């Protein structure tokens, strides 16, 4: 009987796994190496604030118009209040639109700017293709 206990104990020892500190997976990963300055992506440009510091809001007139129509159907005394709310909403948006950049530019000037920007993109793409075709940018295949 004693021999069976020893054999059973050996089997139990064989099935035991080594402590976690000896397992290769439990080693902490090496600290990440800092990227070279050239490899860092450019910082994201901050989103331009809308003029007058306005928040991103939904400027839908549909709810206000719906309220006005409901009040007209019911002959509600709140009709003037809803109409004034709609009127102030229009005024706020007129001010906001007036402060937007480029609103003063005529459509002809906008077309000229668009044409010149497209021309710049075309020439830059051509230059980029030329630079890509140079030998120094080819990556050797191992």
Curated annotation (Swiss-Prot):
PTM annotation (Phosphoserine): residues: 106
Swiss-Prot/TrEMBL keywords: Acetylation, Activator, Coiled coil, Nucleus, Phosphoprotein, Transcription, Transcription regulation
Example GO BP: RNA polymerase II preinitiation complex assembly
SUPFAM superfamilies per the UniProt record, alphabetical: Mediator hinge subcomplex-like (SSF140718)
Pfam families in the cross-refs: Med9
N-acetylalanine found at: 2
Subcellular location: Nucleus
Residue segments, region Disordered: 1-58
The name this protein goes by in its record: Mediator of RNA polymerase II transcription subunit 9
UniProt organism field: Mus musculus
GO molecular function: transcription coregulator activity
Biased composition (Pro residues): 17-49
Record text on subunit structure and interactions: Component of the Mediator complex, which is composed of MED1, MED4, MED6, MED7, MED8, MED9, MED10, MED11, MED12, MED13, MED13L, MED14, MED15, MED16, MED17, MED18, MED19, MED20, MED21, MED22, MED23, MED24, MED25, MED26, MED27, MED29, MED30, MED31, CCNC, CDK8 and CDC2L6/CDK11. The MED12, MED13, CCNC and CDK8 subunits form a distinct module termed the CDK8 module. Mediator containing the CDK8 module is less active than Mediator lacking this module in supporting transcriptional activation.
Family note: Belongs to the Mediator complex subunit 9 family.
Gene3D superfamilies noted in UniProt: Mediator complex, subunit Med21
């Amino acid at each position: 009987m004693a021999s069976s206990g020893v054999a059973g104990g050996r089997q139990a020892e064989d099935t035991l796994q080594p402590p976690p500190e000896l397992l290769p997976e439990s080693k902490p990963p090496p600290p990440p190496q800092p990227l070279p300055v050239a490899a860092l992506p450019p910082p994201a440009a901050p989103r331009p604030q809308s003029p007058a510091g306005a928040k991103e809001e939904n400027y839908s007139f549909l709810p206000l118009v719906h309220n006005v129509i409901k009040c007209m159907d019911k002959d509600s005394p709140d009709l003037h209040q809803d109409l004034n709310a709609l009127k102030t909403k229009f005024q706020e948006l007129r001010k906001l639109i007036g402060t937007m950049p480029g609103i003063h530019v005529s459509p002809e000037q906008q077309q000229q700017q668009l044409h010149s920007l497209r021309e710049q993109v075309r020439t830059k793409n051509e230059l980029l293709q030329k630079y890509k075709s140079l030998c120094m940018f080819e990556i050797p295949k191992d």
